């Protein structure tokens, strides 16, 4: 599946491959000491957010690609 922004598709594939490899080779074997794909995800997320803005896709009120606030901030609990 391609990304919302054509310029983001290669980043999406790179992140998907990294995540799937980490999930299968590390996480499922109990090695949970970090996700080596974090920076790839951030770059991909930024690209998608820019593509959405450039295409004027309305996303007001929609949380996507990771929360921007911690759970305690967003639900009002402490």
Curated annotation (Swiss-Prot):
One of its GO terms (cellular component) is mitochondrion. Residues 1-52 form a coiled coil. Keywords: Apoptosis, Coiled coil, Developmental protein, Disulfide bond, Lipid transport, Mitochondrion, Transport. Expressed in the developing pronephros. InterPro entries: MDM35_apoptosis. Pfam families: UPF0203 (PF05254). PROSITE patterns: CHCH (PS51808). GO terms for biological process: apoptotic process; negative regulation of intrinsic apoptotic signaling pathway in response to DNA damage by p53 class mediator; phospholipid transport; pronephros development. It catalyses: a 1,2-diacyl-sn-glycero-3-phosphate(in) = a 1,2-diacyl-sn-glycero-3-phosphate(out). The keyword Magnesium does not apply. It comes from the Eukaryota. The record marks 27, 41 as: Important for interaction with prelid3a. Disulfide bonds join 8-47, 18-37. Its main location: mitochondrion. The keyword Transport applies. A motif (Cx9C motif 1) lies at residues 8-18. A motif (Cx9C motif 2) lies at residues 37-47. Residues 5-55 form the CHCH domain. It is found in: Mitochondrion; Mitochondrion intermembrane space. Involved in the modulation of the mitochondrial apoptotic pathway by ensuring the accumulation of cardiolipin (CL) in mitochondrial membranes. The triap1:prelid1 complex probably functions as a phosphatidic acid (PA) transporter across the mitochondrion intermembrane space to provide PA for cardiolipin CL synthesis in the inner membrane. Likewise, the triap1:prelid3a complex mediates the transfer of phosphatidic acid (PA) between liposomes (in vitro) and probably functions as a PA transporter across the mitochondrion intermembrane space (in vivo). Monomer. Forms a complex with prelid1 in the mitochondrion intermembrane space. Interacts with prelid3a. Belongs to the TRIAP1/MDM35 family. This is TP53-regulated inhibitor of apoptosis 1.
């Amino acid at each position: 599946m391609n990304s919302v922004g054509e310029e983001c598709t290669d980043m999406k594939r790179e992140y998907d491959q990294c995540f799937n490899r980490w999930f299968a080779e590390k996480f499922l074997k109990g090695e949970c000491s970090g996700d080596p794909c974090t920076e790839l995800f951030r770059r991909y997320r930024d690209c998608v957010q820019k593509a959405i803005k450039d295409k004027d896709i309305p996303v007001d009120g929609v949380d996507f690609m990771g929360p921007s606030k911690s759970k305690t901030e967003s639900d009002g609990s402490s």
